[in-house]
């Protein structure tokens, strides 16, 4: 891999941070604007600052990327996004980092030539998902932080598009894009750039020993920060990261100060250059540089992230104590070296030719006079011309060709310098400028056109069961239109349910890493022959695998496959999916403004707050390869269950914990038992109850209560539920 193919990508939360990143050696900088970025509480850039940053980056031969890596509501997409992006597009913005497939679709159609980078918020975990995004027009994928070097290598071998991966900075406990914890608990959504970081808080933990991971007794209670990870620092394994196929090395930290950006970027710049100069076999990192990185920011030490290990307590800080050492990084302003020729002869204009990287700028001003008294010396002229001030340039060489007996006002010298540099800047920036696309597209005015649908009665009710025992308790109950089951329950329930006319869908893992087990593929073919309807899909990799197999038309998208806006829903409709699930973070009014004709709505369930590659059970109590759980009690005495998913595929011959994940569920279930009349007016196509950590007998009772209300019109019983965002919405 050649040096010019590798990019060091630094963060900037302010213009000062941007200058610090460029000055420290970043090849590219990613920033947030006034809207739609995943760091809403950073200072961020106003329009004028951002336009200036785009030009400054290009003058220095660097790139600037804009984050639009949040989920957008219909009105934001239709009324704001185009006008927000247009000036940056015309100025030459290099790429947009995107999470929302509706945003992806809109930018692809409205801003031709704009590079699209698939954000880590898309949770891209494998080669098929990457290949799918390539086909849709992405030029780069930002990998999930949880991937190993081997997984990244397989992705690189599958697709030619660029791979961007995090090499330094904070680690989220959850897979990025799969965290609702801050949103559900406090209304500040990570999917909107407003995460309050509840994962950094202390919790009292205890083992769960009850059925389905529910607590029946407490053991080894302790209080610490069980979800707080150390920061990642990969300076020692840069050769291995590059060898795996990563082309953009991303530093996290748009919320950090410019000094942090400058310090971290300068160290990675130093060692990248050393790596290409001396080769991987001679690559060594000095102890003082490791200490320097820790002095810049330290949360219980650092780790190399998931690149070389699946998870484990060595990655955990178990506290939120942040330390910095006595370091003061120097903030340097990058200056481009320029060459110039200044021609001064009496009776002719003052002509200045300046060049940078082979590109020229010119100025021709006034008229040079013969000196009446004391002529100007070359030294005096040079001294005046070298006053470049706060420009982006510094002289490497200035040749002055002049008559010995001339006079020219200082004002004219300044004018020549200013005009020549302005001309040079224009020429340097000319290749980046774009014209507005004449095919400008505005989103349909009737977005959410089914908002005032006639009141619907007796919507089909679907049931999802994460546990086989719960499925066996429910599958013969009356009134169930269809079920979403894991593989172990599907084998038992399929034939009986199909014989009674029920739709049957295989629930696939929340996270897909590696290939689908051959055993499961064989059984899927058998189940399809026996009448299985399709699949409940929860991530991009799973969908891409099924699409490749010609099964896209049998996919139901879960709420984690976000469709906040109609453009996103249309994107997936174009992929031929059966239906989507109404997002959990929209309120009633926002759902009403959405096209829900092909949408299923969750009306009951313990909401998954986090999907994590870490394991609370393993980190605190050791791994026993059982799908048990740990309770996390917060400062308000709310108890959350962190459940181990040791065998995501639910097959008999799968290696346990390779890979595994945790699901952290909310403390009380979400339930819209009293909201039937409002839901009837939303125009959704079906309803769902999701059973996860309930005891089987409790699941039966809850189902019958909802069936009585939604099918028989009975009054709802008293039971404690959270309404989630149905009434309030996410910030």
Predicted segments with their positions:
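Surface-exposed amphipathic alpha-helical tracts and adjacent flexible/coil segments at the periphery
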Residues: 1-24, 28-40, 53-54, 60-89, ...
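Conserved non-cysteine loop/helix-boundary elements of the Radical SAM core domain that shape
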Residues: 43-44
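Glycine/small-residue-rich interface belts in oligomeric ring/scaffold proteins
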Residues: 48-49
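Beta/alpha (TIM)-barrel catalytic core signal, keyed to glycine-rich beta->alpha loops juxtaposed to Asp/Glu
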Residues: 123, 562-563
């Amino acid at each position: 891999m050649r040096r010019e193919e590798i990019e060091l990508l630094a963060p900037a939360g302010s213009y000062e941070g941007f200058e610090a990143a460029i000055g420290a050696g970043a090849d590219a900088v990613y920033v947030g604007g006034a809207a739609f970025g995943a760091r809403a509480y950073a200072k961020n850039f106003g329009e004028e600052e951002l336009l200036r940053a785009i030009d400054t980056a290009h003058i220095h031969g660097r790139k600037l990327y804009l984050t639009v890596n949040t989920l957008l509501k219909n009105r934001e997409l239709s009324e704001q996004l185009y006008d927000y992006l247009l000036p940056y597009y015309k100025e030459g913005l290099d790429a947009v980092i995107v999470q929302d497939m509706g945003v992806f679709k809109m930018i692809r159609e409205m801003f031709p030539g704009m590079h699209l980078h698939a954000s880590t918020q898309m949770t891209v975990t494998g080669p098929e998902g990457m290949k799918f995004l390539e086909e849709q027009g992405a030029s780069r994928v930002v990998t999930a932080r949880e991937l190993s070097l081997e997984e990244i290598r397989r992705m690189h071998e599958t697709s030619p598009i660029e791979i961007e991966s995090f090499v330094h900075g904070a680690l989220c406990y959850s897979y990025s894009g799969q965290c609702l914890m801050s949103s559900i608990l406090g209304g500040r959504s990570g999917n909107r750039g407003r995460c309050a970081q509840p994962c950094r808080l202390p919790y009292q933990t205890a083992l769960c020993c009850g059925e389905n991971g529910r607590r029946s007794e407490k053991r080894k209670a302790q209080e610490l920060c069980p979800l707080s990870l150390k920061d990642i620092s990969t300076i020692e394994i840069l050769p291995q990261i590059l060898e795996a196929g990563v082309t953009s090395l991303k530093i996290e930290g748009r919320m950090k100060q410019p000094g942090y950006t400058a310090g971290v970027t300068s160290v990675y710049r130093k060692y990248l250059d050393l790596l290409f100069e001396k080769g991987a076999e001679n690559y060594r990192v000095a102890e003082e540089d490791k200490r320097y990185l820790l002095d810049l920011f330290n949360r219980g030490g650092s780790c190399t992230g998931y690149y070389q290990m699946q998870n484990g307590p060595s990655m955990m800080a178990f506290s939120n104590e942040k330390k910095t050492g006595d370091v003061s990084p120097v903030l340097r302003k990058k200056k481009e070296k320029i060459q110039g020729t200044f021609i001064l002869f009496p009776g002719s204009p003052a002509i200045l030719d300046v060049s940078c990287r082979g590109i020229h700028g010119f100025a021709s001003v006034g008229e040079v006079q013969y000196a009446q008294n004391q002529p100007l010396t070359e030294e005096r002229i040079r001294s005046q011309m070298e006053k470049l001030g706060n420009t982006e340039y510094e002289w490497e060489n200035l040749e002055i060709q002049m008559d010995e007996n001339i006079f020219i006002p200082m004002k004219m010298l300044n004018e020549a310098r200013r005009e020549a540099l302005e001309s040079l800047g224009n020429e340097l920036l000319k290749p980046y400028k774009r014209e507005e696309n004449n095919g400008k597209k505005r989103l349909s005015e009737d977005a959410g056109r089914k908002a005032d649908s006639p009141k619907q009665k007796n919507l089909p009710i679907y049931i999802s069961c994460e546990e086989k025992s719960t499925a066996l308790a429910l599958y013969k109950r009356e009134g169930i239109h269809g079920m979403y089951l894991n593989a172990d329950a599907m084998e038992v329930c399929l034939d009986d349910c199909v014989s009674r006319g029920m739709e049957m869908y295989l629930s696939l893992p929340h996270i897909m890493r590696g290939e689908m087990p051959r055993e499961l593929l064989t059984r899927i073919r058998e189940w399809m022959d026996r009448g299985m309807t399709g699949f409940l899909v929860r991530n991009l990799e799973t969908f891409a695998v099924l699409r490749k197999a010609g099964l896209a038309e049998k996919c139901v998208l879960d709420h984690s496959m976000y469709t906040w806006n109609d453009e996103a829903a249309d994107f997936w409709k174009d992929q031929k999916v059966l239906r989507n699930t109404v997002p959990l973070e929209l309120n009633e009014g926002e759902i009403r403004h959405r096209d829900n004709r092909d949408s299923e709505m969750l009306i009951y369930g313990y909401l998954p707050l986090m999907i994590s590659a870490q394991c609370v059970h393993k980190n605190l109590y050791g791994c026993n390869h059982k799908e048990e759980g740990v309770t996390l009690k917060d400062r308000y005495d709310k108890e959350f269950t962190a459940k181990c998913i040791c065998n995501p595929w639910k097959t008999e011959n799968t290696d346990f914990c390779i890979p595994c994940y945790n699901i952290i569920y909310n403390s009380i279930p979400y339930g819209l038992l009293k909201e039937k009349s409002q839901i009837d007016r939303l125009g959704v196509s079906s309803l769902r109850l999701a059973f996860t950590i309930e005891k089987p007998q409790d699941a039966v009772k809850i189902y019958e209560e909802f069936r009585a209300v939604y099918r028989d019109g009975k009054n709802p019983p008293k039971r404690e539920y959270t309404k989630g965002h149905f009434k309030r919405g996410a910030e």
